């Protein structure tokens, strides 16, 4: 799981907490990337952070849908 965020994004801060908890409970590795540190990430995802990527594919954005994320990580 990769969580795309940016500095001073309150929704991103909430997403970090949620993704950290969910991935921790499921023993799934995850990371955070700042969209503003990479031009291609900013161009593709910059208007809808936070964005959750699962196996490199966009899973969701703006908020963490816990049940849906859990299903993707356990199914």
Map each language-model feature to its residues.
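Non-catalytic, surface beta->alpha helical segment in thiol-disulfide oxidoreductase systems
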Residues: 54-75
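Small/polar loops that bind or transfer phosphate-bearing groups
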Residues: 4, 33, 61
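Thiol-based oxidoreductase modules, predominantly thioredoxin-like and allied folds used
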Residues: 28-39
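Local sequence-structure signature of Cys/Sec-based thiol-disulfide redox active-site neighborhoods
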Residues: 1-22
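Structural micro-motif
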Residues: 46-52
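Short glycine-biased active-site loop of nucleotidyltransferases that positions the nucleotide triphosphate
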Residues: 42-44
């Amino acid at each position: 799981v990769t969580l795309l965020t940016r500095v001073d994004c309150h929704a991103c801060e909430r997403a970090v907490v949620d993704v950290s908890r969910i991935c921790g409970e499921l023993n799934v590795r995850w990371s955070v990337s700042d969209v503003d540190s990479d031009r291609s990430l900013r161009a593709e995802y910059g208007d809808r952070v936070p964005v959750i990527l699962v196996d490199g594919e966009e899973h969701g954005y703006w908020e963490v849908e816990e049940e849906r994320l859990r299903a993707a990580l356990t199914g």
